[in-house]
């Protein structure tokens, strides 16, 4: 199987799950993903943020706040809703993933009335995952936006349901870039070896981890230990900058 690094667009956008995982693993940590938000005005006005990310070198575009029941990406040419993801693939030549959020309803969200507020099509349910798979999504990431109340226990529960439904067809990633509004899951408690074990047993193919230095308490040594542990379980990892350092001036 070719590495992502050696693929042309037509090869990269038609991979099955096994090919997707193999192509990433063969690239040995050099695959770049970029998360974009499609519901806001594009940085380049009439060009999608996904295309902008691809032009800057992204191999995989991760669509955040993407509602599979009512898909919207500002700047995208008019297509049928079910063709939204495939149109992003056509325009970018990239792999495409989406975030789904296993919101813990017992945790009060601080985002009920703002841009980040949840919609039904963004929830990490088996039905939404099946819709995503039918739309051509390559990877589903179970994670949480700031303040939405996504706990690691909720991620495990959603993983189990989604894995049973589509786990043989689509790559599943799980983890958090920050505490996501859950008191007690900050710093090193964002993710632990026990969380990784539970995610793996629930069906995760890839473990999402904060990159060293992006969250207080997340050191290079700590993430090195977690990555090594995830690899020992046969899982891939993705480290993320999900706390605004990439947009800072200083």
Model-derived segments and their meaning:
Residues 1-37, 47, 81-102, 110, ...:
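N-terminal amphipathic alpha-helix/helix-capping segment at the start of soluble metabolic enzymes
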Residues 44-70, 74-76, 110-239, 244-250:
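Alpha/beta enzyme core
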């Amino acid at each position: 199987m070719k590495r992502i690094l050696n693929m042309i667009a037509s090869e990269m956008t038609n991979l099955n799950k096994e090919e997707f995982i193999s192509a990433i693993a063969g690239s040995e940590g050099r695959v770049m993903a970029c998360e974009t938000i499609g519901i806001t005005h594009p940085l380049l006005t009439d060009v999608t943020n996904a295309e902008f990310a691809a032009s800057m070198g992204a191999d995989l575009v991760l669509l955040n706040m993407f509602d599979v029941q009512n898909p919207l990406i500002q700047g995208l040419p008019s297509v049928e809703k079910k063709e939204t993801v495939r149109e992003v693939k056509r325009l970018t030549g990239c792999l495409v993933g989406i975030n789904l959020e296993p919101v813990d309803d017992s945790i009060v969200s601080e985002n009920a009335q703002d841009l980040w507020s949840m919609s039904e099509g963004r929830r990490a349910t088996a039905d939404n995952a099946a819709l995503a798979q039918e739309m051509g999504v390559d990877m589903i990431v179970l994670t949480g936006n700031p303040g939405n109340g996504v706990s690691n226990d909720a991620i495990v529960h959603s993983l189990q349901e989604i894995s049973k439904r589509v786990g043989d067809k689509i790559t599943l990633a799980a983890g958090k870039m920050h505490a996501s509004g859950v008191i007690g899951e900050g710093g090193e408690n964002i993710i632990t070896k026990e969380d990784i074990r539970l995610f793996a047993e629930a069906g995760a193919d890839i473990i999402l981890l904060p990159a060293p230095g992006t969250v207080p308490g997340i050191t290079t040594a700590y993430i090195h230990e977690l990555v090594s542990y995830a690899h020992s379980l046969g899982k891939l990892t993705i480290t993320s900058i999900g706390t605004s350092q990439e947009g800072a001036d200083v």
